[in-house]
Amino acid sequence: VGAGTSDISVTKDGSIIAYGMIPLAGDELTELIVQHYLVDFQTAERIKLASTTGEMITYKDIMMIEHSIPAKEVWELIEPVTDKMTTAVAEKIKELNGGQTVSATFVVGGGGKIHGYTEMLADKLGLPQERVALRGEEVLQEVTFEQPDIEKDPLIVTPIGICLNYYDQKNSFIMVHLNGERIKMYDNN
């Protein structure tokens, strides 16, 4: 669940069997916060992220007036959009899986950290809540960061996966010159 899209992969026996995308994700929530609290996009992002802690959130609106609100107020504001997002994601998952639900769902990305997201998705998929899990640290066990303050959470799972995929596949290509043009080709030995 990224900023602009929610991307979905359905797997079976360790392979991706279907892939889809819906244009609903975290930015929908951020834009709602922008409009409701009269803040800029960056402040709205900070409010959205801070709301995941369940504590008081302090911010300044566009008039530079300081406000403090409970995270629960943000949860109530974004709940209808979170409901819309999880409904669309569940429908797409079922569509990609031949019209039926899946056995389990792993959620990555910042949008999945939103209060109530995994619970709503589980409900719409007809799964027990423990079968819809937000993934983070447990899938990054083999990744070591030089900076000790980097938190292994759902926000970085996809970027790390892209980097590891590139690293694994970088030796699968060779560069050849054909008629004076450099071309990248797959090397299948």
Task: Enumerate the predicted regions with their spans.
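Helical "lid/coupling" subdomains associated with nucleotide-phosphate turnover
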Residues: 7-12, 18-43, 53-188
